[in-house]
Structures are given as C-alpha cells and as structure tokens.
C-alpha cells in the first residue's frame, strides 16, 4: 500500500571508516550530522525529530543516546533511539514522516570500536543457556550460515571467493584510502569455512540521513530519493529453530517492499543495488531472497559479471561490508549508499542514470533481521512562491 504521506531522502553523509584523528564520539556525531544537513540544504532548525541507532554495549556506556543527543541536535527536540540496528532507525524515521506527524526526520547511527572486544560484547548479548556457552558471536553465526550453504551446494566456495573479490575491487574504487588493509585473515581462519579476504575487521564509522515529506519539499527545489517501498522481517533468535541455508525473513521483507513499490521484475526495474554482505555467502543468499537470481543461476551470474560494475545490475559498488565494516551501522550505510546513487551524489562509484535503486540491510546472527528499501529518483520542483529557501 502506498504511503499516505510520501517520504523521501534529501541528505546523506557517510563516514565508512574513521581513523587517525582525535575526535571524540560526540564530535564525530556532530560532524556527520552537519554534513547530512548541509547535503540536504537544511539546518537543524528545519528538523522536526531525530531517530538514532545506539548500542550501549558497543559504545561501552549506559544509555549512550543521552551523551550523543546534544551532538545530533536532540536538545529540546523530539528524539528516539533504537538499540537493535542502524537500519531500524531508518524504518522508524520513515514511518514517522509517513504518518503525517512530522515533516522532517534526521536518522543517525554509529559504530565505535572502543570496546575491548566486540566479539565478547556479542557473546554477552546471546542466549545465556545455549549460544553464549558455545561461545557464539556474529561472525561465528555467519560462518555456520556459510557452512549450511556449503552443505547444500558443495561447489559454492569458488563463487563466494569471486563475490568477495568483486566487492574488494569495488571498495578500492569507491573508498581507495579507507578500504585498504581491512581484511581480517586471523578472524576468518578461526571460523571455517570463511577464507582470507571474505570478511573485514570492524572499523569505526557513522552515517546520517535527512528524510522529508512531499509537502515539505513542495516549499523547496531539491532532488529527492523517494522511499517507494519498505519491508522488514525477523527470524527466531535461536539458531536451532532456523534453516541457515534459507532466508525466509528476507523473502518476507522483499515481498512487502516490492508490493508497496509495485516491483514485479526486479532485474529489469532496478539500476543498482546494495545488499548485506558481512560474508560473500550472505550476498549470494540476498540474490535469491531479493528475486535477482535463483541459487541455480548463481554460478552463471557470478561468472558473467551480471552483478559487477559493468553488469546488468551492479551490486555493492561501494564495496559493501566486505570492504568496510562499521558493524552496527553497516545496514544503514547500504541504504545511504543507494540514496546517494539515486540522488547522483555517489562520487567515484556513481552509476550513470540511476533512477531506481534497491537497498538490503541485514543484522544479527546469520541475517536474523532483514530490511529492504526501494528508492526512486524525484526531480526537483520549483519552490512554492514565497517559500523560505
């Protein structure tokens, strides 16, 4: 069902890897917020509400949004926080605009690496009776997912390696100074069957987007990436209740998003896509769950470059999480990257004449949470007479 109030993305700022500076987290959040507002041509006074994604365990402090609210403009302004994943802040921000109660929303997420061990943080968040005792972290769950796929398709290892190599090449083009040296060989060797270059070490990153309603944009002349469809779904947290070689939550989220956007032939209707790729096996699962290629066609599509930079549907031109992995906000970055593509602001990895883009975000153990977003380009309209620029 189309939204009653049409929401769109008008500003984006992405910091996929922050290194070598002495900024505090509060300063980093202030900077990414101001960059997104500048990209949208707005000031904080134009923002009706803010949604942030903040994880206390990753930040290493209780109620981390309290310390961050001033940096993102939340003092004396409506602000919400979600602890689950960065992409869920986008869902909340979109629905707040779509409900008609807000004209604009600022969505912000960040992922620090100051915790002594992110793997230990993830283990502490796991089920205390079974998963925590394994011990299990997200990378371990991702490896179990890869193993389940290999059991179903023994020849998959070569395809996965090709996907990883594609994304690393894309990352070197999109972010040449940031993507170098992010591979995590020690971590991958500890979690069979993942191989060198298939995963990246966690990095510090941040991302912000500005959302606005159609009525708000009628007062301004600005390009917009309309949110034409959005879906999200969740699988059980207990891995024993799931078939890790399948992705039913992704399929459910896809049906919802495509139904809202009127997408029937995704390979013909999308110009570019960004999908979850904490491992290349996840990207392969995304091809199937998003209706881009059945698993029987994976080998052919990977070999012929269908999803490469010059292919029919380029996937992860940014390099994805395989190149740069700010763990907690990588899902929101997938959405932000597609918004940039649709707005024509992706820089070195911009694809020509993008009008419709597909974003898929996944988080949790072995893609437990899935979010799918369809974005379409809207042309700038002349500002209403007498409107404030």
Where are these regions (language model features)?
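A basic- and aromatic-enriched beta-loop-alpha substructure that forms the phosphate/nucleotide-
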Residues: 82
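A short, glycine-/small-residue-rich helix N-cap motif at loop->alpha-helix starts
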Residues: 85-86
